[in-house]
Amino acid sequence: MAADTRAKAVTLDLRRRLLSSSCRLFFPEDPVKIIRGQGQYLYDEQGREYLDCINNVAHVGHCHPTVVQAAHEQNLVLNTNSRYLHDNIVDYAQRLSETLPEQLSVFYFLNSGSEANDLALRLARQYTGHQDVVVLDHAYHGHLSSLIDISPYKFRNLGGQKEWVHVAPLPDTYRGPYREDHPNPAEAYANEVKHVISSAQQKGRKIAAFFAESLPSVSGQIIPPAGYFSQVAEHIHRAGGLFVADEIQVGFGRIGKHFWAFQLEGEDFVPDIVTMGKSIGNGHPVACMATTQAVSRAFEATGVEYFNTFGGNPVSCAVGLAVLDVLKTEQLQAHATNVGSFLLEHLTQQKAKHPIIGDVRGTGLFIGVDLIKDETLRTPATEEAEYLVSRLKENYILLSIDGPGKNILKFKPPMCFNVDNAQHVVAKLDDILTDMEEKVRSCETLRIKHPPEDTHPTQILLTRQQD
């Protein structure tokens, strides 16, 4: 039986029997079976079209013909490991170098963002001779054991915090200790990192690196205050550590204004290491780590060869080059600026209309909507967010939630997402929020629709917003 003709229930049963339940699905109560993608759209087994607002992996659009053709043509000729000379890997490194500050001139190619961050940790420790890492609260940097250790998002539910890991407050000016009314939140949050470093040093610890997503995503689509990372870098360098910018979810023009999100700090700010993944290959497993000559030479001085079987293979590099070509020829970075500004403006208008929307923030096609139960305490509207994304799915719009309170709507669509798509999403969001408010006024319990065979539908009892 062809997979695309197999009934959804059969596929789900096979998955439940053959795959671990820890490998979770979107919309677990009623998952979507996707069999085809094109541009910003996904299609299920019944041919229904969904607007994809989640998938920042299909960066230039699902199954972009230029990317597909590049992979196909290179596969017809050669795909082998990178120990042989080949033009693709050096051409790709050259093209990437043109997007980065000149100091970041050495490239390592890998297969996933997790591999890139793991290698960044190795290089930082080798260069500094130190062991410890400073990270932001609720951060996520990958699924390898080394990265779970530096990801509070994961380790708080597992073995806990290692003694060599030090957690600084998330620079969230909406929910954190230093908010929008603080005179200098960038300095205040950077001083928190300084205090974390000082506390570690008093215990005899030495800092190897500070890891942060240039715009924290899993943490809730956070936009750190301008100047924060520059000041953090000063504190980290003073402690003898390196600054690692994790661009895996936010790089390659997504923020519109710049190609890399760390460039929001200004042209004088240069991380010591930059890691890339997800969008870099438009769904093909490609990743990269860029660093300085000095850091790379320290790693080379160990005398231990670094080899990655599939990293930088001819097909992966052909795909990476094709993604860069599409970004340029279709002017998707400028497109992200224009469409993102439109979406941000219209979501902000919804904030004035619906009290459940506490904050709208973002840049380019990286946008978060913080849902609250009340304006004074800013209590996360966790259940309401779950209900909302379920209703959006019923309207063929795929959106996810994240953040410590699981109440942040995350907009990270393919870069071809357009103004018509933005208008459609905002209109549906408005309709559903209006309906939710009507149900609250009538004290009606909201229910997430489950498949017909589910006899225990999830119930969500909402409370009224404070006046």
Swiss-Prot record:
Which reaction equations make up its catalytic activity? (5R)-5-phosphooxy-L-lysine + H2O = (S)-2-amino-6-oxohexanoate + NH4(+) + phosphate
Which cofactors are required for activity? pyridoxal 5'-phosphate
Q: Which residues carry this modification: N6-(pyridoxal phosphate)lysine?
A: 278
* Keyword Lyase recorded: yes
Superkingdom of the organism of origin: Eukaryota
Q: Name one GO cellular component term.
A: mitochondrion
Top enzyme class: lyase
Q: InterPro entries annotated for this entry?
A: Aminotrans_3 (IPR005814), Aminotrans_3_PPA_site (IPR049704), PyrdxlP-dep_Trfase (IPR015424), PyrdxlP-dep_Trfase_major (IPR015421), PyrdxlP-dep_Trfase_small (IPR015422)
Kindly name one Pfam family recorded for this protein. Aminotran_3
Its predominant location is mitochondrion
> Which GO molecular function annotations are given, in alphabetical order?
identical protein binding; lyase activity; pyridoxal phosphate binding; transaminase activity
Q: List where in the cell it is found.
A: Mitochondrion
Gene3D superfamilies membership: Aspartate Aminotransferase, domain 1, Type I PLP-dependent aspartate aminotransferase-like (Major domain)
Subunit comment for this entry? Homotetramer.
Report the protein's function.
Catalyzes the pyridoxal-phosphate-dependent breakdown of 5-phosphohydroxy-L-lysine, converting it to ammonia, inorganic phosphate and 2-aminoadipate semialdehyde.
| Family per record | Belongs to the class-III pyridoxal-phosphate-dependent aminotransferase family.
Q: What is this protein called?
A: 5-phosphohydroxy-L-lysine phospho-lyase
Organism, as annotated: Mus musculus
Record gene name: Phykpl
